């Protein structure tokens, strides 16, 4: 797939993103009914997780080095959540659960972490030391292109919720044994920022992308855009909304 140029003013400008031409075509065609639920949608149905006005070949597929579990707050508005974008772009590696449903987390079989800030949270670069502390690292071999690469974790849990609703999930006893990982401070490009929140509060799809990028940089070879297409929809919508703001004189 060819790459689309992004606005230079955007933090998304250097991404290696598949062509947005199918999204441009779908936008011109307008909203359509979701074939599953019948609701009017554009690009995808955020309730059903189905493509709308697009064919599977129009959308890039991303292979991830770890499995991603997203626990969505039941009161999180579907239309404001970016979690479904991860599922559409990496369907083999991403699963979404609506709380109180959570995944089976067997720490005896897998190294699992929860991405959430806190006083005891570690950084991505500290993962290897943490999971190898007993001198017997449990490591799953991950194949990338022609190489077998080592990764200290196999599963990552994210919470999809506004910050003022996270306590209900983060305090669940089923998650208490999971070590926490905190991302480096980065500014969000999300256009639906929570009122009163700092610009370092990332959308779920941004958090997943930055975590995987950091993981790759620390434990694999040089990062060359392997997960950039996770922001395929996000970068297009960001560009679209910025254009609309500029046209309205609000940018």
From Swiss-Prot:
InterPro entries named among the record's database cross-references: DTW, tRNA_Mod/Golgi_Maint
Family label: Belongs to the TDD superfamily. DTWD1 family.
Upper classification of the organism: Eukaryota, Metazoa, Chordata, Craniata, Vertebrata
Keywords linked to the UniProt accession: Nucleus, S-adenosyl-L-methionine, Transferase, tRNA processing
Keyword Ligase: no
Biological process according to GO: tRNA modification
Organism: Danio rerio (Zebrafish)
Record protein name field: tRNA-uridine aminocarboxypropyltransferase 1
Subcellular location: Nucleus
GO-annotated cellular components: nucleus
Purpose: Catalyzes the formation of 3-(3-amino-3-carboxypropyl)uridine (acp3U) at position 20 in the D-loop of several cytoplasmic tRNAs (acp3U(20)).
UniProt-listed Enzyme Commission number(s): 2.5.1.25
Primary site of residence: nucleus
């Amino acid at each position: 797939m060819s790459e689309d140029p992004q606005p230079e003013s955007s933090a998304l400008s250097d991404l290696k993103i598949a062509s947005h031409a199918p999204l441009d075509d779908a936008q011109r065609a307008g909203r359509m009914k979701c074939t599953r639920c019948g609701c009017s949608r554009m690009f995808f149905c955020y309730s059903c997780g189905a493509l709308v006005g697009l064919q599977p070949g129009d959308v890039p597929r991303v292979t991830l080095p770890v499995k991603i579990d997203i626990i969505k707050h039941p009161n999180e508005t579907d239309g404001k959540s970016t979690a479904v974008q991860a599922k559409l772009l990496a369907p083999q590696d991403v699963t979404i659960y609506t709380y109180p449903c959570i995944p089976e987390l067997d720490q005896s079989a897998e190294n699992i972490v929860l991405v959430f800030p806190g006083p005891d949270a570690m950084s991505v670069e500290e993962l290897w030391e943490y999971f190898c502390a007993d001198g017997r690292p449990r490591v799953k071999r991950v194949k990338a292109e022609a190489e077998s690469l080592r990764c200290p974790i196999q599963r990552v849990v994210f919470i999809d919720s506004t910050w003022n609703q996270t306590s209900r999930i983060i305090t669940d006893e089923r998650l208490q044994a999971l070590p926490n990982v905190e991302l480096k401070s980065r500014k969000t490009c999300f256009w639906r920022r929570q009122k009163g929140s700092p610009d370092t509060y990332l959308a779920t799809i941004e958090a997943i992308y930055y975590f995987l990028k950091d993981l790759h940089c620390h434990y694999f070879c040089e990062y060359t855009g392997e997960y950039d297409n996770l922001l395929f929809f996000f970068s297009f919508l960001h560009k679209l909304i910025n254009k609309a703001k500029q046209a309205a004189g609000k940018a």
